[in-house]
């Protein structure tokens, strides 16, 4: 399994100078609110995907009165440790380096450093719009389906061009010119998603049984257009409305994965704590499928695990993560709230300083 052997963070939020050696399995960061616990997890996330899970404004990630931040790790890939790092300055310039070479695309870092991130707002997975759930499915395909990323990139280009033509109200021929490419890649993307969902659902059911055995949720995949029509037929049917609205209404960019209980939306029945456990089950199943398909376990980032969970559920989460045989970074206020296994390292975070205990 991949794991982070060392982590250095400079001038990232309130983390002025962090240099730690994480445990290859369990790492628990504790301290008061605002100490910098979440920022540790956020820095790892940023290095993997090139963005934050807390803000869309990257300038907020740079520590006050400084002009840049640096995140650097050594990553064990199964045979050796490789260096992976990023530097970003206040002008927006950033440099990603992998194994001593400048990387041309952040997808290279994401492939090397697969993460399952569970933030303090994880329960929002069920409440927010379908975009976050599409991203959940697409994360899986990115890591298990070699053809996915090129298909997804082509689809985004075709969709962008078609929407621009619709918004500008160009002649119909210039709008429908993009339909063939959009349909070809859209149908292929849908098939990939459908295949992944079919493999994913039994694993999700297995995980959910551990957390909420009395709540047999059912997952439903919606491809983004009517089951009655092909995508080409749907685009033709919608063309008049698409012109009026200035964008493409149907297609894989409208797909969703919804959970129901007794034919009702899960979020209408479950408490916030239960929704959090459902999201944990989803992401643990995601990691299991990645391991089944590739032999690689993701690294888990679990922010504020104790919140809204009683002691039994917290122990259940820890036991499940332990069975996943992955490296995990967990944050919380009180270390006594978590029953950590022996193979763990505790880190105390205070005023942006991190010390192993």
From Swiss-Prot:
Its main location: cytoplasm. Keywords: ATP-binding, Cytoplasm, DNA damage, DNA repair, DNA replication, DNA-binding, Nucleotide-binding, SOS response. GO terms for molecular function: ATP binding; single-stranded DNA binding. One of its GO terms (biological process) is SOS response. The keyword Magnesium does not apply. One of its GO terms (cellular component) is cytoplasm. It is found in: Cytoplasm. ATP binds at residues 31-38. The RecF protein is involved in DNA metabolism; it is required for DNA replication and normal SOS inducibility. RecF binds preferentially to single-stranded, linear DNA. It also seems to bind ATP. PANTHER family: DNA REPLICATION AND REPAIR PROTEIN RECF. Belongs to the RecF family. This is DNA replication and repair protein RecF. It comes from Coxiella burnetii (strain CbuG_Q212) (Coxiella burnetii (strain Q212)). The lineage of its organism: Bacteria, Pseudomonadati, Pseudomonadota, Gammaproteobacteria, Legionellales. The gene is recF.
């Amino acid at each position: 399994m991949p794991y982070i052997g060392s982590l250095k963070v400079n001038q990232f939020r309130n983390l002025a100078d962090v240099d730690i050696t994480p445990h290859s399995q369990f790492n628990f960061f504790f301290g008061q609110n605002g100490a910098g616990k979440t920022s540790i997890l956020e820095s790892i996330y940023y290095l993997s995907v090139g963005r934050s899970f807390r803000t869309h404004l990257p300038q907020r990630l740079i520590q006050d009165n400084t002009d840049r931040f640096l995140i650097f790790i050594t990553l064990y890939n199964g045979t050796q440790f490789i260096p992976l790092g990023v530097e970003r300055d206040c002008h927006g310039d950033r440099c990603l380096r992998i194994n001593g070479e400048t990387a041309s695309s952040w997808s290279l870092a994401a492939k090397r450093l697969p993460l399952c991130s569970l933030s303090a707002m994880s329960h929002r997975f069920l409440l927010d719009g379908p975009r976050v759930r599409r991203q959940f499915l697409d994360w899986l395909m990115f890591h298990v389906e070699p053809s996915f990323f090129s298909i997804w990139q082509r689809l985004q280009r075709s969709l962008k061009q078609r929407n621009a033509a619709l918004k500008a109200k160009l002649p119909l021929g210039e709008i429908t010119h993009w339909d063939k490419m959009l349909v070809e890649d859209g149908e292929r993307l849908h098939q990939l998603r459908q295949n992944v969902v079919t493999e994913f659902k039994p694993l999700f059911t297995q995980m959910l049984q551990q957390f909420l055995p009395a709540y047999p949720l059912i997952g439903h995949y919606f491809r983004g257009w009517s089951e009655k029509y092909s995508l080409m037929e749907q685009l033709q049917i919608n063309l008049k409305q698409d012109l009026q609205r200035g964008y493409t209404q149907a297609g894989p960019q409208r797909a969703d994965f919804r959970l129901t209980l007794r034919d009702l939306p899960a979020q209408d029945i479950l408490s916030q704590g239960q929704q959090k456990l459902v999201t944990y089950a989803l992401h643990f199943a995601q990691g299991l499928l990645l391991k089944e398909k590739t032999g690689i376990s993701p690294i888990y980032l679990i922010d504020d695990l104790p919140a809204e969970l009683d002691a039994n559920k917290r122990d259940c989460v820890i036991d499940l993560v332990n069975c996943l045989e992955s490296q995990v970074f967990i944050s919380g206020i009180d270390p006594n709230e978590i029953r950590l296994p022996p193979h763990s390292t505790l880190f105390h975070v205070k005023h942006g300083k991190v010390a192993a205990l």
